Amino acid sequence: DQKGKSPESECNKISEEPKCNEDKICSWHKEVKAGEKHCKFNSTKAKEKGVAVTQTQTAGGTEATTDKCKGKLEDTCKKESNCKWEGETCKDSSILVNKQLALSVVSAAFAALLF
């Protein structure tokens, strides 16, 4: 039962290459930085095996990018590269880029399944 546990942490618990590669959602990485685990979550492999896995996101990741534009004046907002003035507020335009990137990755994966 993997409820409440992130797929990454489940894969990180595996310490043997054969067991890691046998798992439907994990892949073994031979070369890793000091302190990193060899067995890591592999979303591509999980999708290919038909495993529905939602990767848990860290709470701080999206908040930090959203807040950097929040509360800025119009002139300052327009000068910032990742911000844009929308209506009466300064908004983070990089979120839109991230959503488009995610959509294109999903589209490419779907197209690969068709061929």
Swiss-Prot record:
Membrane topology: Lipid-anchor; GPI-anchor
GO cellular component, one term: plasma membrane
Pfam family, one: Trypan_glycop_C
Gene3D superfamilies on file: 3.30.1680.30, 3.30.1680.40
Chief localisation class: membrane
Top-level taxon in the UniProt lineage: Eukaryota
Subcellular location: Cell membrane
Pro-peptide positions on chain: 93-115
Function comment: VSG forms a coat on the surface of the parasite. The trypanosome evades the immune response of the host by expressing a series of antigenically distinct VSGs from an estimated 1000 VSG genes.
Name of the molecule in the record: Variant surface glycoprotein ANTAT 1.8
